[in-house]
């Protein structure tokens, strides 16, 4: 009995909603003399902004989600990424930041060090591709460091420092000296008040990033 009442209520609610949407349309398309006409916005009508046009803070940078965590890994090919870079270029993006170079066992480039630690071999070298596309469309690329996943479980940042000291050197030697589009580094580690050793870890990783690259800009996750 209760299920039937609920179904009746939903049917009535749906009919009432449809009627509410249809009634204004029917009234709007019938004149006083019974003739029909189509409503359209006046060509002379325009929005009246109370602030100057093109006076806002322009967004010129964006993050590249390397899709190794929440979304199936590497589900775009280079054609899709190339088109995405074209769209970004057209709207004024000149800086792209890879959120992270890997998470746990999924990685974005064939790192000898991380493969030796049990990570999976990626199907494509996303880092190389991003750098080539950034160079093609005159953008700067920022490399996001590796996320071991251990500190999410333990809140201990020492894992990040240990792994990334090899990743930083490896990446700079492989890509940094090769591509002019390599613009800097991103320490992607997210922290909280429960994270152990965050200040020391950020200092150690950030200093190494700058030292190997001749002082390229290095920033941290907000």
Predicted ranges, named:
Residues 65-75, 111-122, 153-162, 188-196:
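The substrate-binding groove and active-site-proximal loops of carbohydrate-active enzymes
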Residues 148, 170-197:
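Active-site groove signature of glycoside hydrolases
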Residues 190-199, 206-222:
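Extracellular glycoside hydrolase catalytic/binding regions
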């Amino acid at each position: 009995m209760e299920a039937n009442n609920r179904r009746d209520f939903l049917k009535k609610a749906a009919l009432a909603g449809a009627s509410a949407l249809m009634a204004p349309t029917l009234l709007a398309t019938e004149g006083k003399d019974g003739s029909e006409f189509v409503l359209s916005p006046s060509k002379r009508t325009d929005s009246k902004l109370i602030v100057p046009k093109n006076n806002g803070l322009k967004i010129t940078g964006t993050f590249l989600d390397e899709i190794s965590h929440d979304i199936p890994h590497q589900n775009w090919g280079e054609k899709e990424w190339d088109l995405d870079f074209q769209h970004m270029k057209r709207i004024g993006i000149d800086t792209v930041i890879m959120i992270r170079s890997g998470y746990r066992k999924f990685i974005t480039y064939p790192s000898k060090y991380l493969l030796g630690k049990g990570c999976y071999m990626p199907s494509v070298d996303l880092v190389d591709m991003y750098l080539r596309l950034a160079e093609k469309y005159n953008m700067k690329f920022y490399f996001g460091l590796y996320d071991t996943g251990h500190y999410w479980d333990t809140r201990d940042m020492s894992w990040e420092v240990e792994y990334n000291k090899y990743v930083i050197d490896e990446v700079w030697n492989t890509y940094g000296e090769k591509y002019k589009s390599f613009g800097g580094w991103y320490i992607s580690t997210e922290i909280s008040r429960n994270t152990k050793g965050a200040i020391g870890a950020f200092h150690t990783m950030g200093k190494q990033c700058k030292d190997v690259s001749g002082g390229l800009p290095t920033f941290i996750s907000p």
